[in-house]
Amino acid sequence: MVTLRFFKGLILSDSYAPGLKWSEELKAYAGLAYLYREVKEYFKESGVEVSDQVLDTLPLPPLRDSVRLRDYQREALDAWLKSGKRGVIVLPTGAGKTSVALKAIALLSVPTLIVVPTIDLMTQWASAIREKLGVEPGMVGGGRDEKKGITV
């Protein structure tokens, strides 16, 4: 069994995985946190059991999926899914990027953090989550500090 941990922006492992280097100081194989997914997949594909102590996620209640996508939004979501659920959705203003993101959240049903640059957008996102997914999101910013399974 391999144990994965998080420490100051690093993924630590007691066994080697591609992208990790031995750190004498940490007494573990270490790599930047963005490698987490690849490291975890490497051990899974190698048939190695993983004790994952990296993420301590908040519980996510069941989501209602009332998001309906237009064809071009569905194409954007499908392209994102085919690229390993990574990348950026680029659509013009008013084309429904929020709807695409809400559909992705509903499909994956995993704890989610949405980062926005203004309090107005935080409020808009929270309203959309309530309306389309049927859950009360957490909100951090503008004097609020409540974290939930979906947090804006």
Identify the role of each PLM range.
Residues 114-115, 139:
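Structural beta-sheet core signal
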Residues 120-145:
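Conserved helix-turn-beta segment of the N-terminal RecA-like "Helicase ATP-binding" lobe
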Residues 38, 100, 124-125:
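Phosphate- and divalent-cation-binding pockets in alpha/beta enzyme and binding domains
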Residues 147-152:
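Conserved two-lobed SF2 helicase motor
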Residues 73-84:
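Pre-Walker A (pre-P-loop) alpha-helix and adjacent loop at the N terminus of AAA/AAA+ ATPase modules
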Residues 1-75:
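Accessory DNA-engaging acidic/polar modules
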Residues 83-108, 113:
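Walker A/P-loop
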